Regions:
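Non-catalytic cell-wall polysaccharide-engagement segments
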Residues: 3-27, 71-218
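Secreted/periplasmic proteins that engage bacterial cell-wall peptidoglycan
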Residues: 29-79, 83, 87-88, 100
Length: 218
């Protein structure tokens, strides 16, 4: 299946247009939205280490906890080392000293669509995320599940507002998004990267050549 793009993908990522078209069509999710998420999460793999579908991101240390220690014992990430950080973890606003898991060669974010190793432990430890079609399909499943959860928690939310909240949930989780909306806060306050939703929507529209390409089923 061929996807027409108003703005071309980078040369080494052109194959992702067909992946997004095939998976998006089968799952009922806009392929332009999928490409927008891929851009925001990994710059189509260019921001990963190593570059490409098998690369990882998010190299910020995480403090040791019983659950985290258990996961790392069951399926350790290569190059993630347990260390005492005298100065703490500034990115997480944790003062030192703190015992933490510190990524060196492998990060917590898996693949083109950056599934978190801990939040999606079974999927990530399987290694299936390295296959573009599989991680795109899994992203569709996550988006659809987040949308259903938001509809239950916020039954009056619909249209573009529901679509944007669904996109925010990909980054922050449906529960967190619903709480922020109930508290009258913006999606920018909720996501862990400023402008996350707009970045995805704008990029999706660039690829499509029209506004609203990211809306559900567009």
């Amino acid at each position: 299946m061929t996807l027409t793009l108003a703005k071309p993908l980078p040369k080494d990522a052109e194959y992702l247009a067909d992946v997004a078209a095939k998976i998006g069509s089968a799952e009922g999710v806009s392929p332009y939205l999928l490409l927008g998420i891929c851009y925001a999460e990994s710059n189509f793999g260019a921001a990963l280490k190593p570059k490409g579908p098998s690369g990882s991101g998010d190299f910020i240390a995480r403090p040791c906890t019983p659950d985290r220690d258990k996961r790392m014992k069951e399926a350790p990430l290569p190059g993630v080392e347990r260390k005492v950080l005298p100065e703490g973890i500034k990115a997480r606003k944790l003062a030192g000293p703190v015992e933490a898991w510190v990524p060196t060669t492998t990060g917590w974010g898996c693949g083109l669509l950056q599934f978190d190793y801990e939040a999606h432990f079974d999927f990530c430890k399987s290694g299936q995320w390295k296959e573009p079609a599989i991680i795109f399909r899994s992203a569709c499943g996550l988006l659809k599940q987040s949308r259903k959860s938001l509809q239950k928690m916020l039954p009056t939310l619909d249209g573009a507002a529901l679509d944007r909240a669904t996109i925010a949930s990909y980054n922050a989780g449906a529960g967190r998004v619903a709480k922020f909306i109930k508290d009258g806060k913006s999606l920018d306050d909720c996501t862990f990267h400023p402008g996350y939703v707009d970045k995805i929507c704008n990029k999706a529209d660039e690829f499509a050549g029209y506004s609203g390409s990211w809306m559900w089923g567009a």
